[in-house]
From Swiss-Prot:
PANTHER family: ENERGY-COUPLING FACTOR TRANSPORTER ATP-BINDING PROTEIN ECFA2, HEAVY METAL TRANSPORTER
Any one GO molecular function term: ATP binding
Protein name in the entry: Putative ABC transporter ATP-binding protein BT9727_3105
SUPFAM superfamilies xrefs: P-loop containing nucleoside triphosphate hydrolases
Function: Probably part of an ABC transporter complex. Responsible for energy coupling to the transport system.
Subcellular location, record wording: Cell membrane
InterPro entries documented for this protein: AAA+_ATPase, ABC_transporter-like_ATP-bd, ABC_transporter-like_CS, ABC_transpr_CbiO/EcfA_su, ECF_ABC_transporter_ATP-bd, P-loop_NTPase
Length: 551
């Protein structure tokens, strides 16, 4: 049987670079598979995905061949490629080109010359399948991140593709929107028979959906097989262990023979064994510190007659505290960060830093002492190479020492090997690290971070978490907006949930997540009855004996 898509001994190096992004890749994909590409940042996942669609082939030197339904990729007709091979990217903003949802859906169909009655029929049928009729005539700019990504997916599906490629499609979605999006992908795969190849760092939700997992490292395929086989292989190599989702990781630590991947599977296994006993230890309360940053009764809207994004919101952040802002896409987390940074001014209320109204502080002092990283890191970039981005800022701050400091900083953030690359050619995770790397050069005492772990692989995420903890011990105050529940649960001091323009929950992670049904970790959902405050596999492993499954 001819493979749906096939790659034979593909190697690729980007233009003006020496290190190969892909090395000797051979891969065969059958119709109807649901494949998850796993691996570290810069391991070649995005580059590999782009080699399945000729319009997206990156510029550089390649050897080897790619086939689609038995035809060399470069010989696949343009119209066929446009219709049958679809791709959804990480950033929901990047693919939207029209003003309204219905225009976005019609755009691609009009481009391939379909008559209006066929366009109307396809859109009607798809909207009925996806179930978002209420969004059809809305402006795409008013949609939440989850809704925008749903529209991106719909704009690809309306072409009736046979192969669907997705590059970290849930990276900017809140946990509930991400779960809904992935559930829709599974439905598309099972009900429509569309082949799916998806790259992802957060494997907890996607591995249970996959029929096959491919793990990459340094441009090579290191493991390829069923989810259980690949996870078992990853367990044998220390550097891949952080990539294993929380529930299977816990059971592997317990030396279980049959590894569960979902909360339901894990609970069924636990029901077969003696109940876990636990001591409900009191949670230590940290000493109160001085309030260094506050927002007092602030309200904000982008236009005079537009809806309020924030309404009468009051928060206070203590010196040296690490706070996570969580909540659904569109609840105002990013807006609040820009107000705290002094980049925008509240319509009502005041933001104070060190007791001073933020807008009365000299802008140079603000820029040096307050580090802000947007959820769109490429907004920060003004130079043509990674090196220039870091060196020019280091030279501005430290003069002749700038070169040495820039080299050290690039190595610290795993970017030195990319120093000649254009920032826009870096992966999403690499862009995130570059923006963070540059921002930290000024040694800010306040860090305001919008989705700082987005696009980072689990290993780098742990290193960044440790770096933030070190900065915190040195007196840095950190406020971050995040959808990464596991990261927040493991590292932060305080969690605040935004809803309807206000903070509705504010607590330490263990109290915050243990009281939630949806906004909590997979480990807590699995074992909250036995261990109410357990949020990570480490929490459970510490509380339970190693041989629990054999008791």
């Amino acid at each position: 049987m001819v493979a749906h898509a096939e790659i034979n001994n593909l190697s690729f190096v980007y233009a003006d670079e020496n290190e190969y992004a892909l090395q000797h890749i051979s891969l065969s994909i059958q119709k109807g598979e649901f494949i998850v590409l796993a691996g570290g940042s810069g391991s070649g996942k995005t580059t590999l995905l782009k080699h399945f669609k000729k319009e997206l082939l990156p510029i550089g030197k390649r050897t080897g061949d790619t086939y689609y339904d038995g035809t060399l990729l470069e010989n696949v007709p343009d119209l066929l490629s446009a219709q049958e091979i679809g791709m959804v990217f990480q950033n929901p903003e990047n693919q939207l080109v029209m003003d309204t949802v219905i225009q976005e859906l019609a755009f691609s169909l009009e481009n391939i010359g379909l008559p209006s009655h066929i366009i109307q029929k396809r859109i009607a049928e798809l909207i009925s399948f996806l179930g978002f009729q209420d969004l059809l005539h809305q402006s795409v700019h008013t949609l939440s991140g989850g809704q925008k990504q749903l529209v991106n997916l719909a704009a690809v599906l309306v072409m009736q593709p046979k192969l669907l490629l997705l590059d970290e499609p849930t990276a900017q979605l809140d946990p509930i929107a991400a779960k809904e999006f992935l559930g829709l992908l599974k439905r598309i795969n099972e009900e429509l028979g569309i082949t799916i190849v998806l790259s992802e760092h957060r494997l907890d939700e996607v591995i249970p959906l996959a029929t096959r997992v491919i793990c990459m490292s340094n441009g090579r395929i290191v493991y390829d097989g069923s989810p259980k086989t690949v996870v078992a292989n990853m367990w044998e190599v220390e550097k891949f262990r952080p990539f294993i989702p929380q529930i299977p990781r816990l059971f592997l630590e317990w030396n279980a023979k049959d590894i569960p991947f979902t909360v339901r599977e894990a609970q069924m296994k636990l029901n077969n064994f003696s109940a876990i006993s636990y001591v409900n230890k009191p949670i230590a309360q940290s000493e109160k510190q001085e309030v260094i940053l506050s927002a007092e009764h602030i309200s904000f809207q982008y236009e005079k007659n537009s809806p309020l994004i924030l309404r009468d919101l009051t928060v206070s952040i203590e010196k040296g505290e690490w706070v996570a802002l969580v909540g659904k896409n569109g609840t105002g987390k990013s807006t609040l960060l820009t107000l705290l940074a002094g980049l925008q001014k509240a319509r009502r209320g005041k933001v104070k830093w060190n007791g001073k109204v933020i807008h009365k502080i000299d802008s140079k002092e603000r820029f040096k002492s307050i580090g802000y990283v947007s959820q769109h890191p490429y907004y920060h970039f003004t130079f043509d190479t990674v090196w220039d981005e870091v060196y020019e800022r280091a030279r501005e701050l430290y003069g002749e020492q700038g070169k040495e400091i820039a080299e050290h900083q690039l190595k610290k953030f795993w970017l030195y090997g990319l120093k000649e690359r254009h920032p826009h050619d870096c992966s999403g995770g690499e862009q995130q690290l570059l923006a963070l790397c540059t921002t930290l050069l000024s040694k800010p005492t306040l860090l305001l971070l919008d989705e700082p772990t987005k696009g980072l692989d689990p290993w780098k995420k742990e290193r960044v978490g440790e770096l933030f903890r070190k900065l915190q011990k040195e007196g840095t105050t950190i406020v971050m907006a995040t959808h990464d529940i596991e990261f927040a649960a493991k590292y932060v001091d305080q969690c605040m949930m935004l809803f309807d323009g206000a903070v509705i929950m504010n607590d330490a992670p263990k109290e915050f997540f243990s009281g939630n049904f949806f906004y909590t970790t997979s480990i807590n959902r699995f074992i909250r009855k036995e261990l109410p405050y357990a949020l990570t596999w480490e929490d459970v492993y510490e509380a339970c004996p190693n041989d629990i499954l054999h008791s």
